[in-house]
Structure formats: C-alpha cells, structure tokens
Amino acid sequence: MNQRFLQITTLLFALFSLSKSSAQSVTALKTEYLVNPIGLDSTNPRFTWQMDDASQGAKQSTYRILVDTDSASLIKANAKLWNTGWVKSDQNLIVYSGQLLKPFTKYFWRVDIADGNNKKSNKANIASFETGMMKMENWQGSWISDTENTKLKPAPYFRNTFNANKKIKSARAYIAAAGLYELSINGKKIGNHRMDPMYTRFDRRTLYVTYDVTDAIKQGKNAIGVLLGNGWYNHQSTAVWYFDRAPWRNRPTFCLDVRLTYEDGTTETIKSGKGWKTALSPIIFNSIYTAEHYDARLEKTDWNTPNFDDKGWKDVMFRSAPSKNIVAQALHPIRDVEEIASKSIRKFNDTTYLFDLGKNISGVSKITVNGPAGTVIKLKHGERLYPNGHVDISNIDAHYRPTDNTDPFQTDILILNGKGKQSFMPHFNYKGFQYVEVTSSGPIQLQKEDLVGYFMHSDVPVVGEVKSSQPIINKIYYATNNSYLSNLFGYPTDCPQREKNGWTGDAQIAIETGLYGFDGITIYEKWLADHRDEQQPNGVLPSIIPTDGWGYEWGNGPDWTSTIAIIPWNVYLFYGDQKLLADCYPNIRKYVNHIDETYPTGLTTWGLGDWIPVKSKSPVELTSTCYYYADVVILAKAAKILGKNDDYLKYTALAKKIKDAFNAKYLNKEKGIYNTGIQTEMSVPLYWKIVPEESVALVAKNLAKRVEADGFHLDVGLLGTKAILNALSENGYSDVAYKVAAQKTYPSWGWWMENGATTLYENWPIDAKSDISMNHIMFGEIGAWLYKSPGGIKPDEKQPGFKHIILDPHIMEGLDNFEASHIGPYGKISSAWKRTNNGIRYDITIPANSTASINLPVNSGASISVNGKITSSNKIDLAAGKYVIEQKVGK
C-alpha cells in the first residue's frame, strides 16, 4: 500500500462516526503529577490533563491555561498570575511560567481546550495546588529532640499546647523529620500516611510533609503531639550493611510549623522549640529493619490532648538541621492500602497460634487480644513454614547480625496491660510475610478474626491491566504486581524482609513493569534525586541507594547502576516529560565518562553479572559491556533531545566504539553466536541492540534454537530475564517466548505459581539453600513483556508519552484471547484480541489527542477490515477512537 493510500485510509478512520460525536471535556488535571497537591516547593510546576472525547479522530488543537489565587475569577476566565491565551498546540504537559509563585499560597488553575473544529471544552475545569516552604529560610520552628542518646531504645513523645483565639480560615502543618514520625492534634492522628518522611540520604537531603489540619484545630486551646521513630536515621539493629554506623546517625529529630490563617486575614505560626515537652512512649523498641516492641503498661492516656498533665515531662533539646536541604515530599505516600483478613488459624496449644493471610505481602499485622497484665505476646512473621507448621524465617534473616536475643527478626513484641481487649499494630516498621506465629507467655484465646494484615506500600495509582485466557499467565501477572508493590516504599527495594535496600539492579530490571502497571513517576523522580545525592565526584554510584556508604566497592557497575540512565529514559518514554532526563543528564555523563576513562578499550568487566542464573554463567564483561553501551546510547539520545549537539556527536562515536569492540570479541558472525551461545549471551546483546543489523536474524534464530534445546525453560539470571522474552518476541519468535513465559515446570515463573506462590521469588529452585527471599522483584520483567508482546502496547520514541502509540500485538499459540490496557498521559489505551472461527478480532481504543500505528501479523490470503471497511495493508495508522479490526482467513 502506498503512503498516499495510507493517509486517505487514516483520514477515513478519523472521520468515521463523527455524527456520533460526544461531549468534549478535560479531565485528570494534575500538578506535578498529583491531584490538587499541597506543600509544593516547585517554582515552575508542571500541569497535565487529558482530553475526554470519545469522537473518532478527537484531537486537541489549542489550549489555554489560567492561574489565579481566586477560583471565582477563573470561572469568569479571568487570571492575574498567568494567562497563556489560546495557544495552538496539542500538548498536554505544560510548565508554569507566569508570575513568581509565593510560599504558603493556594493557587487555582484552569485549562480550556478546543478541537480541530474549534469546538471548545464544555465547562470550566479547575484544579488547585498549594506551595509550601519553597525556601529553607521560611521555616520558623527549631529542630528539637529529647536529651537521650542513640542507644536508648524507647521512642519519644513530644507535645505542646497553643490557643487559637480567632476563627480559623485554614491551617497547615509542615513537618520535617530525620527518622519517622506520627503527628497528632487534639488526640487524633493527622493523615493516613505511613512511614513519613521517605528515606533519603539524611545528611544531604531531608523531606518535609504538608497536611491540611483546618478541621483538626478548634477555636481555643489545642494540643499538638509528635511521636518519633528511628527509621533509617537511628538504626539500632545490626546487619551486614552497617546502617548502625551511618555517618548521619543520631537520635531522631523534627521541625514543625503549624501555620494558622484566620478569617480576618492575619496569620500565626505555632512552631517547635521552646516550651515543648518530651517523655518516653510505650514503644520500647522500634526498628524499620526488624520489628517493634510495645509495653501497654506504659501508656500515657490522652498524652496528645489539651488538658493532659505533663508536669513530669522533660524539656526538649535543640538540634541543628540534619542537612542544608529540607525539601517537600511531593510524591504518592505510603499507606495501608489493603486490609487482609486471615485465611485460616491453627491452634497448637493455649499459648501458640498460627495465622495465614493466604498471600505474601509487605506490611504489618494487627492483633486484638485480651490477657493479664504483663503477658508477653510475640508475633513472628515469615514467608514459609517448617514441616511441623511453625514459622520458618531462615530464608530471610541471613544478613541479620544481632548482638543479643532482645531483637528477634521480624518479631513484634506486645506486653499487655490487663485492661481488657487491646489492639496493637506497629507504627514504624514493616515486614515481608504471609504467616504470623503468635506465642504468649500465658494462656490466651484467639480467633481467626483477631489478626488481620495490612498490605503497605507507596500508594501509586493503578494504570495497567492484563487479562488472558491462560490461568498461569494471569497468576504470574498477579504475583509480579504483588512483588512490585511490596518493594515500593518511596524508593524501589529488592525485598521487604531480609534487606529492604534500594538495589539498583533490581530496579532497572523492573522499571517498565512498574510504569506499565502504575503511575510511579513521583517515586522515581524522588529516587533519582537520591542517586544524584549519592554520586561521587568521579561519577561512581553505589549499588544500593540510599546508602550509609555501603555499596561503592561491591555490587555496583553498569549492569546495576545503569539506573542513572535507564530509569530517566523510560520515564521520558512513558510520560513524554524531559525533566528527569535533564536533571540527571550531568550525572549520566559523569558516570559514562568514568567508565570510558577506566575502560578505554570499550569493554568493561565492572559489575556483578547475570546474578543467580539457573545453571549457565555468562562472562561479566559481556553483560556489563552491553549495559555500558545502553547507557552511552541513552546519553547520546538525551544530548540530541536536550540540544547538546557536541555531546550527541561525542557519545554517538563512543557507542560505535563500544559496539565494534564488543562484536569483535564476542560475536562469531559466520555462526551467528555470541560467546558459547547460552541464553543470556544471546538475548542480552539482542535486547540492547548491540548486534550488527546484518547479524540480528541469525542470532535470533540461534537463540530460539537454544531455548528449544533447553526444553523452553529458562537458563538465565537477573540480566537474562530482562532480555530473553523481549529478544525472542522482537525478532519473530513470540511463540517461543510464550512457551517460556507459560512454562509450568522447573525452572520457570510458572513453576513458582504451581507451588503456591503469590509473589515472585529470588531463586529458581523453591528449595534453594541461599538467596531465597520469596518476595523479590528482580525477575519481574515478564510483567512488562505481557504489555509489549501479547498486548503489543509500546511507546514511540519519536513521540513519547504515548502521544503516538505503537501497537504490535503478537498472536501466540496457546492463547485464545488477551487484553492489555494502560492509562498513559493522554488516556486509556486498550489492546485486546481473540480468536474467532475464521481469524482474529482486535478491539482497540486510542485515547483522544493521540494516534497509533498497528502492525498485524502477516497472513497471506487474509482479509482485513477496520470498523467494517476493508483495507489491504497489515500496517494501519489510527486516529483516536475505538476500532474493531478483523483479520479473516479465506476458505
């Protein structure tokens, strides 16, 4: 089909059903990727929206943004701070460039759009955002703590009272902490966040959180309470990463401003400092790594209420700020996202019970129990059981180095006060577990309903969905998402129990899985800021981020710390937003330059290699050089995007040098085999596109043969799992990839599912003796592959952010139907197909203001129709709208 015919066909598809056009509106208004956020520090926040128009071919032609402090003015289309006027553009990501924003101010913004027929959106669409401190000098409160040292175990309470003598219009609490905190006013906890603030390199960047506390404060006398936890700041548990020796370590501290705005327009700030009192709480020990201990006999009832008698409390100690960079926590918070009832209970005797949640999670348990004062309840959390039915934690405590027996791993301790039923749930800890073994120092009676679990993680919106006709695929997808979320706590982790570390290798493997399934840009922007904090002057990054200093000498290298390039690049592809790529550009360049200077031949042996392979080991130089090449290619592309032409030329040449050196050493061109031809050695070069174009077909063919010879089972480690399915699918062997993905016998993802897994594991054998966490995300690329291959949904590098969508669904033997959807920046993309009596039916949805190109499988003699209209090409351009495409095989 010639290009002219394609254009005509596309136009026809765009015009089809215009008579059925629907009302046009603007939805999903966000500021900095959050809905009506408060406490932003950005002087130039980003505005995003979506066009809601089901008409075929719907497209935004112009937009207008209005910003003001008065929402009523915006309804009348008046704006004092910023009025862009009608801008001819189809973009929906715009950076604010109006008048200078002021701190502590609520702003409203409105966006109006028009389509190609100048039909304007049908109502005023108004959102808001509110600035926070914006500058360090705007803080009025002092950093305070108690007078204890880092070795003291109980967590401290802090309190103060104040009078609000006028009618309050609004009130905001701004709280920064090194450690963790819970804020309360007049006896009630503020907000539903958990584990605030997020973990950072405390001596380089500390986060603060803003709360709307208008409804919590009453006219008259009020009380503020703060409970501090250790978090990663005062790590008292000892393990192989030496967080107990962190350079920032100190007793937890906080700074608080509560800003009151009265109805008469005046303001008042209640601040931390002189007059505050402190005492020890009933939390007699808390470790984010191990557990929490609580002595209910020490409870101070109503300690955070106005009339509490605090005469016995001590004065606070003033402290210096933990860093010179106190910035807003502008990201999706950690929450108790799902309450999970116990699936079963087993009673061993009157002092020992086992609860099973039915699935492996990250989070906490909550127990409700009654017993005599002084009764000690221990709640041991684990992922698996011994044959006798008791909880086995030997797979997750391998790196723990306790100095005594007072802090058992993943074991909460509750001491009862004898005052009837009481409930306990940790404040400053989370664990990875499915089972909870409850033991008591004396007889107790428990029912199944007495213990529930809470699945805790960063509460990122779900934006993806996968469904298939094959149950094993559905189980794998479910388990992959469980592991992804179990390892998202303001930064991506490897596992929620044994380590809780921000391992870079695991995160670069899972980045696409995360972005297809969840709206995670705010988490990754925060974590890449952690990268920038941790990078050494020579460009080296540690293998875990954040870190106390561990990881600069082991575990890092391009196969792990390529996160500095791979994650910003993927965020750019998925969101069409250059900011993270631009913010990290100097760091990527510094990193690449370090490798270039250290390994001038273009080949590097720096890295861990294909971690935890099934059986075959690939040379570290082979895999690390592929990642080095990927970093340089990303750097060159970023240079071009950001207008740095000299860098573009420089790093394009460096990429060629690496590619030539790599293929000269490892590629047998005649045979089409890399090194010895095992799965990782063949798939990693294909995936990262370092294979010479003329050799791709033969290398892919040999990879498919290798996989078939391996019985369609995996023979890869961490790096190979990122590549294997994609390398096959992208090069004509999607059926082979599917046989691997849907495999149910060892070694495979399905093997885990067949043995009861609800998450992904760290090792292929379920009876491995080491490296056997049962909730790891490092083999999680299969989640992204389901979107890319059977789903066929891919971003277009030339029009990122799914402005243009590449649809390339692969019809695979063994699947009768498949559905994938992803809510991108422009709306919901749907790609579904099913087998019919005479072919394949595709149901496609392209969101308004975007376009797509679909590549259908070549099938000689088949007829293709789009919404009932026959076309002669298997490559079809689509405007926005819904399509039924039928590919029928002639008799």
Summary of predicted features, one role per range:
Residues 246-257, 269-307, 327-338, 735-891:
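Non-catalytic C-terminal accessory modules of carbohydrate-active enzymes
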Residues 180, 271-280, 443-479, 485, ...:
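Active-site acid/base region of carbohydrate-active enzymes
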Residues 171-175, 185, 364-383, 439, ...:
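Alpha-helical support elements that line or immediately flank enzyme active sites
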Residues 149-153, 190, 198-202, 212-214, ...:
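Alpha-helix capping and helix-loop boundary segments enriched in small/acidic/polar residues
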Residues 224, 294-296, 499, 517, ...:
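C-terminal capping/lid segments that line or modulate ligand- or cofactor-binding pockets
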Residues 1-26:
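Bacterial Sec-dependent N-terminal signal peptides
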Residues 25-498, 505-506, 522-525, 542-549, ...:
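Extracellular/oxidizing-compartment recognition motifs
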